[in-house]
């Protein structure tokens, strides 16, 4: 509902291409992958994930673990149903916080669940369409800072399918 913030989980995702340029380029069998970060006092486990069978040339996306120094909240700022009840407009706001000592790039995916006929009529950031009902924002957030993503979507229903 309007005005209430919803906490969203934030996870660390490792994305790479299975090719020779990335130091791979062979078929990778399915199985558990553990990712470590090299540090002066030894390696630190960042997380682990299940890898699916991956052919040479395919992209790999591994969701490693929930991170606690990045936070995200979602809030509906405004919503309006048209007088003829054939369109619904809502403004959503995401607050992305980075408590890390270095800048990060956050990929924010959002689902547009109300209807397949939608249009983004205003947005604070560039976005791309993932599929018929989802969009993606790529947001750079400076170290110790917060960034706000805000967009307005208008859904339209055919006259026989009013909400």
What kind of feature is each model-predicted range?
Residues 1-163:
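Long, intrinsically disordered, low-complexity accessory segments associated with secretion
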């Amino acid at each position: 509902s309007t005005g209430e913030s919803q906490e969203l989980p934030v996870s660390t995702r490792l994305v790479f291409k299975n090719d020779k340029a990335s130091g791979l380029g062979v078929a990778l069998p399915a199985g558990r992958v553990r990712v470590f970060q090299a540090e002066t006092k030894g390696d630190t486990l960042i997380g682990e994930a299940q890898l699916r069978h991956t052919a040479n040339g395919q992209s790999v996306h591994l969701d490693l673990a929930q991170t606690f120094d990045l936070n995200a909240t979602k809030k509906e700022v405004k919503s309006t149903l048209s007088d003829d009840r054939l369109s619904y407009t809502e403004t959503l706001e995401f607050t992305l916080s980075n408590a890390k000592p270095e800048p990060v790039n956050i990929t924010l995916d959002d689902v547009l669940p109300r209807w397949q006929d939608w249009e983004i009529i205003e947005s604070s950031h560039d976005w791309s369409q993932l599929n018929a009902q989802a969009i993606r924002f790529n947001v750079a957030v400076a170290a110790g800072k917060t960034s706000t993503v805000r967009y307005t979507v208008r859904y339209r229903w055919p006259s026989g399918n009013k909400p």
